Amino acid sequence: MLELSAFELAERVLAREVSASEAAAAANARVEEVEGDLNSFITGTPELALERAARVDERLRRGEEVRPWECVPIAVKDVLSTRGVRTTCGSRILENFEPVYEASALLSFGPDPIMVGKANMDEFAMGSSTENSAYGPTRNPWDLSRVPGGSSGGSAAAVAAGQGWWALGTDTGGSVRQPASFCGLVGLKPTYGRVSRYGLIAFASSLDQIGPMTRDVRDAALLLQAIAGHDPKDSTSAGVEVPDYLSGLERGVEGLRVGIVRELVEAEGVEGEVREISLRTARALEEAGARVGEVSLPHAGYGLPAYYIIAPAEVSSNLARYDGVRYGLRVPADGVHEMYRRTRERGFGDEVKRRIMLGTYALSAGYYEAYYGQAQKVRTRIIEDFRNAFSGYDVLLSPTCPTTAFGLGEKVDDPLAMYANDICAVPASLAGIPAISVPGGLSGGLPVGVQLMGDYFSEPTLLRAARAAEQASGLRFRLKP
């Protein structure tokens, strides 16, 4: 059962060939088997998963409508609010925080989302390796000496190891796509506003987006079908009709225009074999009928520094709410200002403190226009670059990451080296366009992801291209370790 895709498992549960309870029990057993090696979860919810699975089975017995995504156990990144289940954001400052409401993305799963646990993550989603968690690092199921990527590394490890059939992650500057690449999965960042952010604890509000992490593209399409749509509780939620993401998935890429992004394929630090796998994927799409050419995003090289000004600036504002007064950790002290200082000093980790300071500096009087204002101008230029590119191409292609998964501890003390991992991912985040990472091949026995990017709300086309790329790679999901 653990080898099935989420789509296949849903088919079998709905056909009453297996029960949701059996699926939940299998996931729980797998968590118990490998969690000691991986540390995929901050909070396990095995009993809750069994209770909810039993209710799904009862609804099926009564002949009630049960949608495919309601049948499949899921791992949930610990940045999404779950009513009555602690939600830590990987931080000590929220160690005992239990939300009183559920994130809208989880409400999409009906009354009984079969959640196997809250997945580990970099603290407040700030990181590229899941080493910044206050609850210990997560290890990559492909090689336990390596990172799974971040910040959604726990979600990626859980899916790769079969601790759940799929997972919800969040992507601010690559945090779904990069761990998907490192763990041999499909990771989709939808168009900004396609999925409600209500109940998502904010990192950078103009960038954060919830996305699927799955075993294959068909599962990603099914999970997006579940969570996409307008939500009046989220002012940034787009009132754009949700299409059927599965209907055209197998149509192929005949006539599709695919542009290879020169600046990202040739970016500094991109390993030769990673570059070759991306170009090989482009050739495979061309052989399948796509029209492939080269395209330029002239300002893509400025995306990384712009991102690391804009995102910390939003962090500085968003994390001001953690003061020990309303919720979360409170460290006693003489006087309210000393209590603020001690609470934040003890509650936040080093990377979070670093980004708060960077953001506060960028927003300070005398520096706002020189840093934040200029970064926003770069963001506008990148949006214009994509607009020009999509006038001639339907899908753009690049590596997802410059390298394969690196070793635990290798970059954790070198912030600039860690940030450089995001060089291929941040342009799509700054523009708010959809982007997906699909397995393209192996380098040194480790998975390499290829990134495809589409125009706003073009997820059906993007998923169709990703499905063709996935099939061309010849790779098939296998449980690790």
Curated annotation (Swiss-Prot):
It catalyses: L-glutamyl-tRNA(Gln) + L-glutamine + ATP + H2O = L-glutaminyl-tRNA(Gln) + L-glutamate + ADP + phosphate + H(+). It comes from the Bacteria. HAMAP family: GatA. Heterotrimer of A, B and C subunits. Its EC number is 6.3.5.7. GO terms for molecular function: ATP binding; glutaminyl-tRNA synthase (glutamine-hydrolyzing) activity. Belongs to the amidase family. GatA subfamily. The keyword NAD does not apply. PANTHER family: GLUTAMYL-TRNA(GLN) AMIDOTRANSFERASE SUBUNIT A, TRANSAMIDASE. It is an enzyme of class 6 (ligase). Allows the formation of correctly charged Gln-tRNA(Gln) through the transamidation of misacylated Glu-tRNA(Gln) in organisms which lack glutaminyl-tRNA synthetase. The reaction takes place in the presence of glutamine and ATP through an activated gamma-phospho-Glu-tRNA(Gln). The active site is at K77 (charge relay system), S151 (charge relay system), S175 (acyl-ester intermediate). Keywords: ATP-binding, Ligase, Nucleotide-binding, Protein biosynthesis. GO terms for biological process: translation. InterPro entries: Amidase, Amidase_CS, Amidase_dom, AS_sf, GatA. GO terms for cellular component: glutamyl-tRNA(Gln) amidotransferase complex. It holds the Pfam family Amidase. Gene3D superfamilies: Amidase signature (AS) domain. This is Glutamyl-tRNA(Gln) amidotransferase subunit A.
